[in-house]
Structures are given as structure tokens and as C-alpha cells.
Amino acid sequence: MIAARHYRKWWLSHIWPKDFSWLVPIESSSVPGPPECPALDEKFQSCQTVDNISLARRVGPPALLYSTGIDSSIAALVARVSCIPTGGHSSCPREYFLSAKTSLVSLVPTMDWTAAEHESGVTQNHQHRMQTEDHDSFAGEIQKLPSPPAGNTGGQNPSDPADEQGWPQRVLNEMKDMLLLLSSDGKILYASPSCKSITGYDANQLQQNALERFIHNDDKTTFAEEMNECITTTRPVHCHFRFRKKDNSSNTSCLLEAHGHPHMKTSEPNDSPENHNEDCIGVFLLCRPYPTRGSQLLDSFLEHKIENVRLNQRIAQLREEEEEDLASGQQLYAGDSTGDSGFRHNSHSGRSNSNQSSFRDTTGSGEENESSDTLTNDDPDSRSYLENAADELGQTEDMSHIEGIEMLTGLHYGDGERSQGLSTGVRQGRLIRYDMESAKLDQQARVIQDSDRKKRQKGEYMCTDCGTSDSPEWRKGPEGPKTLCNACGCKSAVQYTLFSYSSEMSS
């Protein structure tokens, strides 16, 4: 303490100049200042060593001290100066601006805290430039600082109690999420005003109603389980549910994300341990819409899945209709063929119908196909019927092929009309008439010629040893390739082997 006092005395006497002539009073204010301090007034009235300090009195709390590199006791001492009137200036107001020429100490005033001038209790702080002995760069300017807390105003008027009471309601009105206060049985005791923008209901329409009344039927069970677990375990709850909106005509609902916690009432400490339990007074639930973009993506994904299922069902339905059409066409062909062949027996016709259906059913099993082939090979009537049905089906396919050509080219292809160079853009292109009957005869003649050629090819070879011509295989003989039948060729090979072996043994 002694060292600090000597340091303070040395600092005040050597660093600060001994000039106190630049005190500049500021105009007084109508608002009363801090109370008088006679003891400190007498002490500082006799202090003439405080130089290069501008003291000016004004209304408001004490000035704020900014100090750098000086002793804390000196900073406290200088801070005390700003609250005390000086001698010889009785007309000065009751607060001072304190500013140092050096960079060690800088004291600047705070803003006025007057509730009468502003509803928030803060008025504008008018800046003043300190007058010093010489106008150099060390002269500081008064800075604007935030207003002090309400508890540090000292003698200032406190803020309006009515404004303090309106803050909770203002917070609830500005809140975007929906706040619900539920009873232990799930009844809505309070709903924040934001429920109108989220659900479409007013607060009075939701209050005194069960929350489950507005929840989707599929989510009621899950929500009830979450709430019961929250009340039983006294743990926070986090769940999602669909809330029905007010527009019941379209049966729309919004997906909400809810966070909440129970409010428990503890028994009095004087109660017995048997009665010392916690009762749930209510549950605070804060609900907000689930992210809109994610819900839209989820809805679109579900819509695409549903559309895919619907299209697959439609494809299966069309396939069934196509199979029914094919079956009806086959039955029509079967009826025509049975009308043409009147000599068939009823039992044979029934069996042939079953064989035809099994023959045309590509989705059947291998056993059914095998049984149909067996019946076809055994029964000549069924074989002839199947051949006729296959010919008629081939003609039908040919007709459909011809119709497709006519639709694409515009020619009467079935009547024999042909195009030469028209489709390729040749100038000499023309339409010609092709005789379908002669074409059919030429085709039949070509088929006969092909069959005769195959027969002639089969009968060209003749065994030079036995003279046969129906051998399945032909072998090379003394006269060249394919001159011996299979039997004669084997016999000739054996004889040649024995002859060569005997000649080797004799030699």
C-alpha cells in the first residue's frame, strides 16, 4: 500500500502537467444528478496537482474508465473524480467528462438512461470534443456506448413495468412455432397464436379440446405411446405426427415435428415418504412443420411408386385380355374346322380341342406338351386338324404381315401391286401389277423342284459292290469316294487290313 501511494503521488506530480485552466463546463440538464459527496468535495477542492484533466459535469451515471498500463488504484482514483464536483465551479452540472492527454488514461461518458425521453430508457448521447491546452492528436473524442443494465442505473428511473409485463406475450406472438400446453390427459390448455398459420385453426378453436382429435388416425396410437412414456419416465419427447388442417373438404394434413417435456409437481418436503411422489401437471409441446422440401420429395417418391404399381397392374390386365382374345380366336378357328370335317366323332373333336389348347399354350408345363405330342402322333384325325389349324394360323399371320406392309407403303400389296423405284426416288419409278395366282403357282413349282432336287441328290450315289442307293452313309472304295455303302465299306476295310497283315507276315 505504501509503495502504491508513493507511485500514485509520483505519477500525479511528474506525468500530469500542473495546468488546470482548461476546465470547460457543459450546460446543465433538467434531470437531477447523483447526490452530493461533501467529504470528497473538500478533498478534491484542495487538490491542485491534477493537471491535463478536463472535468465537466452533466446528468447521468458516472463516466466509464478505459485504462491501459496504469495501476488499478490510480484508475479507481480517477474514476472517483468524475463523480465529484470541483471547487470554483458551483454552476457546473453534476457529472464530468474525464479525458487524459496521454494515452494511459481515457475516461468517456456513457449514454443517458432516462425513461421519460425514450420508451426503452435510452437517449442519444451527444458527442463533445474536449478542449485541451494544445490541439494535437492526443485529444480524444467522446464515444457512444451501450446503455447500462437496469440494475446499475442508480438514481435513474426504472423502465415501465407495463412494458416488462408485455414481453412474454410479445415473444409468444412473434414465435413461428406452435406452442401447446397439454394436460396429463392430452387436453389442449393453451395454444400460441402461431397455430393459425400452421394448422388454420384459431387458438380458441384448439383450446379445451383433445389433441388426438386433430391427429391423423394412423398416428394416434404412436402419439399416445410417446406421451405416456414421456409422462411415466419424465423424459423429453420427440415425435412426428400428421395434424389435420381446418380444410376438411380436401382432407389435408400437415406433418409436424414435436419436441416437449413434462412439467412435474413435487410433493411438499414435510409429507411422508409414502406420499412423496411426482405428479404430472402438464406437458409443454413445441410443434413445427416438418421440412417442406423433404416432405415434398417424400410425397413425390410415394406418388411415383404408386404410379409404377398402377402401370404394372394395367400391363398385367392387358396381357390377360390379349390371351383371352387369342383363346377366343383359336376357338373360332376350331369351330370352323370342325364344321368342315363332319365325319369326325364327337369324342375325337373334344380330344383334339384339348390337344390344340395344350399345343398353343406356351406357358404350360413340359408334361402337358409331351402328352399333347403323344396324342397327336397316335391320332391321325388330331394330326390333320392341327395341320389345318397351323395353316390357318400361318395364313392369318401372313395377312397381318400384308396389312402392315399396305399401311406403311400405301400399296395394295395383297392385290399384287408393287413399286419399282418409287420408294428410292428414281425418276423412272412406276407401279406394276403382280399376278398373285401365278406367283403362288411359281412358288409351288419351286417347292416341287426343290424337293425333286433333294430326292435326286439322295439317289445319285450307288454302291459299286452291292448296288444299293439308300445307304445312310457312304464310304471310299477302290473307285473313289462315296462309291461303297456303309456295310460294303466296312467289309472292304477289314479285308484290306487282313491282306496287308498277311503280306507283312509272309515277308
UniProtKB/Swiss-Prot annotation:
Domain of life: Eukaryota
GO cellular component: nucleus
Record key words, sorted: Metal-binding, Transcription, Transcription regulation, Virulence, Zinc, Zinc-finger
One GO MF term: zinc ion binding
Gene Ontology BP annotations: regulation of DNA-templated transcription
Mutant lacking the gene: phenotype: Reduces the conidial production under both light and dark conditions. Increases sensitivity of conidia against thermal and oxidative stresses. Decreases aflatoxin B1 production.
Family matches, as InterPro entries: PAS, PAS-like_dom_sf, PAS_fold_3, Znf_GATA, Znf_NHR/GATA
Disulfide bonds: none
PAS domain sequence ranges: 170-234
GATA-type zinc finger segments: 463-488
Induction remark: Highly expressed in conidia.
Described purpose of this protein according to its UniProt entry: Probable transcription factor involved in light regulation. Plays crucial roles in fungal growth and asexual development. Involved in conidiophore formation, sclerotium production, and conidial stress tolerance. Positively regulates the fungal pathogenicity towards maize and aflatoxin B1 production.
Name of the protein described by the UniProt record: Blue light receptor lreB
